[in-house]
Amino acid sequence: MQYEAVIGLEVHAQLLTESKIFCGCSTQFGAEPNTQVCPVCLGMPGVLPVLNKKAVEYTVKTGLAMNCKIAPYSRFARKNYFYPDLPKGYQISQYELPLCEDGYLEIMLNGTKRKIRIKRIHLEEDAGKNIHDPSGYSFVDFNRTGVPLMEIVSEPDIRSPKEAALYMKKLRAILRYLGVCDGNLEQGSLRCDANVSVRPVGSTEFGVKTEIKNINSFRFVEKALEYEIKRQIKLIENGEKIIQETRLWDSQTGTTQSMRSKEEAHDYRYFPEPDLVPVVVSEDWIEKIKKDMPELPDQKIERFIKEYGLPQYDSEILTEEKALSEWFEEAVKLGGKPKEVANWIMVELLRLLNEEGKDINECSLKPIQLVELIELINKGTINRNTAKEVFEEMYKTGKTAEAIVREKGLTQISDDSVIIEAIKEVMNKNPKEVERFRNGEEKLIGFFVGQVMKITKGKANPKLVNELIFKILKE
């Protein structure tokens, strides 16, 4: 029997507000433990929360970007559960009346668009962080307690681990474009829980689901889901029951481990938060937020295709990061041809950044430097192979292309007499290959070009080398 996966994702995004959701404490990451706390976020008796308006604005902005209906009236609720990192014994969240509902995101898979519905986006406070010491003691850092958190809940529309990763990437790109979340999975500012079940292909009923926690990279989203889907199918085929539970992804072993039984909503005993008035979002406020919305990834992809004549694939790569798309456009404004600039970014620049685990914001190379390098190629000062060497040196040192070419003596050889001399040297060393070429094996042209480039240390003009070899060998 064939099975299909049914996947829904719950994504928690920490909002880039300067202060926490219900108090004035800083949200800065990396401070000394328990230095960014106050009686409000520590849940001391008698304190009252005051809602951070910017957190509401960011949530509404996200809802609009994800095609949601914005609730004119929403309400906070207390979610009751006991855990060491929750000082009040409850979390202020939203339950029955969230800020945003009924939205969707579109992902592109194998050239086909897939719509993933978004059930709701609600606002809540984050919990603290448990730190487990090797000595056997556990500590709690409450700095994160009360940091504004947006929970984005998808419908169970995702059908494969690949789709789940694409959805996550798209969602993170939108959050970064909006400037509401930095999307850092490693630091925990973007966290993902996955609900997954399997069912026979063609069935419309849902299977028993498990929730997977501790997924902190796009690669692990795929790997965790792949493992869990296989585990569930194996249980079914062995006649065993799947237990509704929360499981922890272990990246070291590549497996999911049972953590606890999965809670239902009634286990949390939700009730309206008595210390906060309902949130009212007026049409005027929504219109004001709409006017401040930036160009989003999908809109930018469409524009890059129309304005610059780029293929869909190139446009998608260049718009994954807002800063990367801006780097590309700056280079084009400075005179670079769009496709040429795109190729250098996608092949060389991204390769070097990935090797160092950096993003474009950490890159010291400027768009003008790439444009100047391309000009040297087009003028015939250097060839493309040499240009790759120059580009890498530019990336490492920050020097201009012209300075590197001058210092290293990389100027392209376009003097016929010098190239002819090199060709004759190759012919004298390889008489058998010359004879084979003259007998019709013209595919050997690549061999001769390679040998000439070797003698000239890659500096000969490849086009001229090609032309002269044909001319001389045909004599």
UniProtKB/Swiss-Prot annotation:
Keywords: ATP-binding, Ligase, Nucleotide-binding, Protein biosynthesis. It catalyses: L-glutamyl-tRNA(Gln) + L-glutamine + ATP + H2O = L-glutaminyl-tRNA(Gln) + L-glutamate + ADP + phosphate + H(+); L-aspartyl-tRNA(Asn) + L-glutamine + ATP + H2O = L-asparaginyl-tRNA(Asn) + L-glutamate + ADP + phosphate + 2 H(+). It comes from the Bacteria. Its EC number is 6.3.5.-. GO terms for molecular function: asparaginyl-tRNA synthase (glutamine-hydrolyzing) activity; ATP binding; glutaminyl-tRNA synthase (glutamine-hydrolyzing) activity. GO terms for biological process: glutaminyl-tRNAGln biosynthesis via transamidation; translation. The keyword Chaperone does not apply. The keyword Membrane does not apply. Belongs to the GatB/GatE family. GatB subfamily. Heterotrimer of A, B and C subunits. Allows the formation of correctly charged Asn-tRNA(Asn) or Gln-tRNA(Gln) through the transamidation of misacylated Asp-tRNA(Asn) or Glu-tRNA(Gln) in organisms which lack either or both of asparaginyl-tRNA or glutaminyl-tRNA synthetases. The reaction takes place in the presence of glutamine and ATP through an activated phospho-Asp-tRNA(Asn) or phospho-Glu-tRNA(Gln). This is Aspartyl/glutamyl-tRNA(Asn/Gln) amidotransferase subunit B. It comes from Thermodesulfovibrio yellowstonii (strain ATCC 51303 / DSM 11347 / YP87).
